[in-house]
Amino acid sequence: VAFAGIMVMQPEVIILDEPTAGLDPVGISELMHLLQDVCRQQHTTIILSTHDIDVVPIYADVIDVMDKGHMVTHGTPAEIFAQPELLREHHLRLPRISHLLEILHKEDHWDVDASVSTISGARKELLRHAAE
């Protein structure tokens, strides 16, 4: 109801602080799809603050990584998740799918791109590896 009231005002920008906190995976998916659909229809920008790193590559176009109030890096999900050591240095983990690909690459010597951070991207990498 609160979100609907805000959207009626047709804001150009919406700032959300940890909107997925406390939600189960289905609730997270439903909320994020709703936000994505409504904002695309109304051409609204969402600035999202989150610690849920698995949501970020799915829904973000641009990422700003911050640590202790300072910007550490800025870029697309592909650019950001291609820097796993930088993320770890600032106490962030990789998305689960990136972590899995990183393990396959480092420990099992699979020729996969460990910076991939979405399920569809991982599927392409695994199919490419299987075809080799």
Regions found by a protein language model. Give the residues of each.
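Catalytic Walker B motif of ABC-type/P-loop ATPase nucleotide-binding domains
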Residues: I14-D17
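ABC ATPase C-loop
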Residues: V1-F3, M7
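A short, proline-enriched helix->beta-strand linker immediately N-terminal to the Walker B motif
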Residues: V8-E12
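A short, surface-exposed alpha-helical micro-motif characterized by mixed small hydrophobic
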Residues: V56-I58
